[in-house]
UniProtKB/Swiss-Prot annotation:
The lineage of its organism: Bacteria, Pseudomonadati, Pseudomonadota, Alphaproteobacteria, Hyphomicrobiales. One of its GO terms (biological process) is pyridoxine biosynthetic process. InterPro entries: Pyridox_Oxase (IPR000659), Pyridox_Oxase_CS (IPR019740), Pyridox_Oxase_N (IPR011576), Pyridoxamine_oxidase_dimer_C (IPR019576), Split_barrel_FMN-bd (IPR012349). Its cofactor is FMN. This is Pyridoxine/pyridoxamine 5'-phosphate oxidase. It is an enzyme of class 1 (oxidoreductase). One of its GO terms (molecular function) is FMN binding. The gene is pdxH.
Length: 216
């Protein structure tokens, strides 16, 4: 185990704007503000988020995915429906997200209910992906054992030969999900671990939010 005395205690920080975010009255405008700042300060993938799900035994899984859209209906990402995450969401359509923007010393935690996006939404997003990524979606049997990298590249080449000309359609097993929040927590690092933390809560989508300030 790491020697605790070797870990430096934080006494200073750099952060985003100095506005008091704890005065925000609803979460989506605050998220938009923070996400806009993260787009300017993060070295890569400010839309990266940890996605937590549970399997049918209650054992949790977590992995990084990329948010591909958000509005007041929720946060959207895409993947294979047969993947581990897809199967777990089919069995238990609830999930948690975490955005961590280290450059701003901020994080946003989200908990909510999950619904599939429409075929029209999935088609529209898939059409924006680079062709090589589209081919990879056809070739990948996500979350299944893979013999070798070469075998994967062969599978991609086989699919590419079928779509030399024209558009690549969306695979039927590839789609997206929308997480509609019932909890959104905003956390901002402060010196000496005296952080600022607020949570917005509601019982269901469409209902008004209640804001609670939390001990750090």
């Amino acid at each position: 185990m790491t020697d605790p005395t070797s870990i430096k205690h934080q006494t200073t920080l750099t952060s985003g704007t100095s506005a008091d975010f704890t005065q925000a009255s609803e979460p989506f405008a605050l998220f938009a503000e923070w996400f806009s700042e993260a787009n300017k300060s993060e070295l890569n993938d400010p839309n990266a988020m940890a996605l937590a799900t549970v399997d049918d035994s209650g054992l949790p899984d977590v992995r990084m995915v990329l948010m591909k859209g958000y509005d007041e209906d929720g946060f959207v990402f895409y993947s294979h429906k047969a993947s581990q995450k897809g199967q777990e969401l089919a069995g238990n359509p609830k999930a948690a997200l975490l955005f961590h923007w280290k450059s701003l010393r901020r994080q946003v935690r989200i908990r909510g209910l999950v619904t599939p996006v429409t075929d029209e939404e999935a088609d529209a997003y898939f059409a924006t992906r680079p062709k090589q990524a589209q081919l990879g979606a056809w070739a990948s049997k996500q979350s299944q054992p893979l013999e070798s990298r070469f075998a994967f590249e062969q599978a991609i080449a086989k699919v590419a030969a079928q779509y030399i000309i024209g558009e690549v359609p969306r695979p039927p097993g590839w789609s997206g999900w929308r997480i509609t929040p019932v909890r959104m927590e905003f956390w901002h690092d402060r010196p000496f671990r005296l952080h600022d933390r607020i949570e917005f809560r509601r019982d269901a989508a469409g209902q008004p939010w209640t804001k609670v300030r939390m001990y750090p």
